[in-house]
Swiss-Prot record:
GO terms for molecular function: flavin adenine dinucleotide binding; mRNA dihydrouridine synthase activity; tRNA dihydrouridine synthase activity; tRNA-dihydrouridine20 synthase activity. Its main location: cytoplasm. InterPro entries: Aldolase_TIM (IPR013785), DUS-like_FMN-bd (IPR035587), tRNA-DUS-like (IPR052582), tRNA_hU_synthase_CS (IPR018517). This is tRNA-dihydrouridine(20) synthase [NAD(P)+]. CDD domains: DUS_like_FMN (cd02801). The gene is dus2. Disulfide bonds: none annotated. GO terms for biological process: mRNA processing; tRNA dihydrouridine synthesis. It is found in: Cytoplasm; Nucleus. It comes from Schizosaccharomyces pombe (strain 972 / ATCC 24843). Catalyzes the NADPH-dependent synthesis of dihydrouridine, a modified base found in the D-loop of most tRNAs. Specifically modifies U20 in cytoplasmic tRNAs. Also able to mediate dihydrouridylation of some mRNAs, thereby affecting their translation. Pfam families: Dus (PF01207). It catalyses: 5,6-dihydrouridine(20) in tRNA + NADP(+) = uridine(20) in tRNA + NADPH + H(+); 5,6-dihydrouridine(20) in tRNA + NAD(+) = uridine(20) in tRNA + NADH + H(+); a 5,6-dihydrouridine in mRNA + NAD(+) = a uridine in mRNA + NADH + H(+); a 5,6-dihydrouridine in mRNA + NADP(+) = a uridine in mRNA + NADPH + H(+).
C-alpha cells in the first residue's frame, strides 16, 4: 500500500456500527480524505478458527469471515483500500501482531485504539485502559511498528485521549512518538468527559510541538463539524489532520466542501450504497435511524423504523433498486495527482505559493506532489524550509532536473511553466496535459501571464494561476 501522508487530511473517525463499509464509501465520495473502520478486537479475529479472507466476486469486495458461521466481521472495497485505516482493539503485543497480519495486505494503516472509554474495553485492558498501563501501550505499538509496519510497508498509528494533566499527556505523546508510529490522533477530551462536553484544545499547540520534534503526524478529534471547519482547525492549531465523528454520524455529507446535503438525500444515498455492498440489514437500519434524527419526513421515518427487510426500506424511500456494477453508486475515487513547475526565480515563486490560497485549492483537487524543475546545484539548501512547509499542506515537493523531466510530465496532471521552456511545453502538449503558461517579457525579464490578450506583471501571476485552478475545481464538481 505504501505509507500514508496524513497532512491536510479531513477524515472519518472510527465509530462502532457507524463506520462500516457503506458509510466509509459515502464519506469518501463526499470528500473525506481518509476513513477509519470501526474498532475490531484482536480476539474477535483470532479466537477459535481465525477469520478467513474471502474474495466476494458478486460485490467486488474482500470479506473477512468467521468460520464456521461465515459471519462477515469486516468488508473492504477496492475503492477505499489505499485510504482505509483498520482500528484494532488489543491489550497484547502478540495478539495485536497476529490479528494485524490477517488484514495488513488489504488496508493502508493499522490504528491502535487507546481511547475507547466503554466499560467492556477498559475492563479488558484495551482502549482507554491502555492509558493507565502505558508500558503495555508502548509495547503493543513497538510490536506493530516492527512486525507489521516495516515488513508490510503500511502506517501504524494510535488514537488516545487527554490525560488528567497537561504534563502527563505530553510525556505520553513523547513516549508514543518514540515507538516509530507514523501518526497520533488526540481526542481532545479526558476519559471521564462526555462527548457533549466541549473539546479541550487549550494545550493542543504544545502536543503539536512534541510531534513535530519527533517527525510524527498529529491529528485531532473532537468538535469538528465539517470539512471546512476541519481545514480551519488544521490552520489554527498546526495539526496535520482532523477526524470527524458525531457530525458524520448525523450527516456524512458534512465532508462536502460545498456544504451538506439534506438528511433525506443522505439517507437515500446511504440505503443505495448499503444495498450495493450487501451490508448487514440490522446495521443499515441502525445507521439510517441516526441519519433520520431531527428534522425528517415523518411518514418515511415511521416506515423505515418499522421495516423488517430491505424491501420494506426500499418501499419507505420509494426507490427501485437492482444490483449493478457499482459504477453509479460507488464511483471511482479521485486518485492522488502531481504537477510540474518551472519558473525563473523558483524559491521566490514557491514562497509566493505558500503565502497564497493555491495550495489549499491543489489539496482539494487531490494534488499531493509538486515536481520543481531546476538545474541550480545550490538550490536544495534554499528549499529545505520550503519543503517542510509544503508537507504541512499535504504536498511533497521534489526537485528534478532535465534528465527526469519526461517521466515527471508523463505522470503529472498539471504543468505550470514559462513559455520559453519549449522542451517542457512540447512534452506537455504531446502528453495532452493541462498547462498554465507564463510568457517572459523581454524588456523586464519578469514573468507575465496572458489573460484575455493582455500581459500582466509577475505579481499577478499567482492570481491567474488561482483562477485557472478554480476552473479545474468547478469542472471536478461537475464531474
Amino acid at each position: 500500500m505504501g505509507l500514508l501522508n496524513y497532512s491536510n487530511k479531513v477524515c472519518l473517525a472510527p465509530m462502532v456500527r457507524i463506520g462500516e463499509l457503506p458509510m466509509r464509501l459515502l464519506a469518501l465520495r463526499y470528500g473525506a480524505n481518509l476513513v477509519w473502520g470501526p474498532e475490531i478486537v484482536d480476539k474477535a479475529l483470532l479466537s477459535g478458527t481465525p477469520v478467513e479472507r474471502v474474495v466476494n466476486d458478486r460485490i467486488n469486495c474482500i470479506d473477512f469471515v468467521k468460520p464456521p458461521s461465515n459471519k462477515v466481521l469486516f468488508r473492504v472495497h477496492p475503492l477505499e483500500a489505499n485510504r482505509l485505516i483498520f482500528q484494532l482493539g488489543s491489550a497484547s503485543p502478540e495478539l495485536a501482531v497476529e490479528a494485524a497480519k490477517l488484514v495488513a495486505n488489504d488496508v493502508a494503516g493499522i490504528d491502535l485504539n487507546c481511547g475507547c472509554p466503554k466499560h467492556f474495553s477498559v475492563h479488558a485492558g484495551m482502549g482507554a485502559g491502555l492509558l493507565k498501563n502505558q508500558d503495555r501501550l508502548v509495547s503493543i505499538l513497538d510490536a506493530l511498528v516492527n512486525e507489521i509496519g516495516k515488513p508490510y510497508k503500511i502506517s501504524i498509528s494510535c488514537k488516545i485521549r487527554l490525560l488528567e494533566t497537561k504534563e502527563d499527556t505530553l510525556k505520553l505523546v513523547e513516549r508514543i512518538c518514540d515507538t516509530g508510529v507514523r501518526a497520533i490522533t488526540v481526542h481532545c477530551r479526558t476519559t471521564p468527559m462526555r462527548n457533549t462536553e466541549p473539546a479541550d484544545r487549550s494545550y493542543l499547540s504544545e502536543i503539536v510541538g512534541v510531534c513535530r520534534n519527533k517527525d510524527v503526524s498529529i491529528l485531532v478529534n473532537g468538535d469538528v463539524l465539517s470539512y471546512n471547519d476541519g481545514l480551519d482547525v488544521i490552520e489554527k492549531y498546526g495539526v496535520d489532520g482532523v477526524l470527524i465523528a458525531r457530525a458524520a454520524e448525523r450527516n456524512v455529507s458534512c465532508f462536502r466542501i460545498e456544504g451538506p446535503l439534506s438528511s433525506f438525500k443522505v439517507a437515500e444515498e446511504f440505503l443505495k450504497m448499503a444495498l450495493e455492498v450487501d451490508n448487514n440489514f440490522g446495521n443499515t437500519k441502525y445507521c439510517l435511524n441516526q441519519i433520520m434524527q431531527g428534522s425528517f419526513r415523518k411518514n418515511v421515518r415511521q416506515l423505515a423504523q418499522t421495516a423488517k427487510t430491505y424491501e420494506d426500506l426500499k418501499k419507505a424511500f420509494e426507490i427501485e433498486y437492482k444490483h449493478s456494477d457499482a459504477s453509479s453508486v460507488c464511483p471511482t475515487l479521485e486518485k492522488e495527482k502531481s504537477l510540474v513547475i518551472s519558473f525563473v526565480d523558483l524559491p521566490s515563486f514557491l514562497e509566493s505559493l505558500l503565502a497564497s490560497n493555491i495550495l489549499k485549492q491543489l489539496s482539494r483537487l487531490h494534488f499531493t506532489k509538486i515536481f520543481a524543475v531546476s538545474e541550480e546545484e545550490d538550490i536544495c539548501k534554499q528549499l529545505d524550509d520550503i519543503h517542510e512547509k509544503f508537507l504541512c499542506h499535504g504536498i511533497a515537493l521534489s526537485l528534478i532536473s532535465a534528465d527526469n523531466l519526461a517521466s515527471a510530465i508523463a505522470s503529472a496532471h498539471l504543468v505550470i511553466c514559462m513559455e520559453k521552456d519549449e522542451s517542457i511545453m512540447n512534452e506537455a502538449v504531446c502528453d495532452q496535459k493541462i498547462t498554465i503558461r507564463l510568457p517572459i517579457n523581454s524588456n523586464t525579464n519578469e514573468a507575465v501571464v496572458e489573460c484575455e490578450n493582455k500581459s500582466m506583471q509577475s505579481k499577478h501571476a499567482l492570481d491567474i494561476i488561482q483562477e485557472r485552478i478554480k476552473d479545474l475545481e468547478e469542472k471536478a464538481q461537475v464531474v
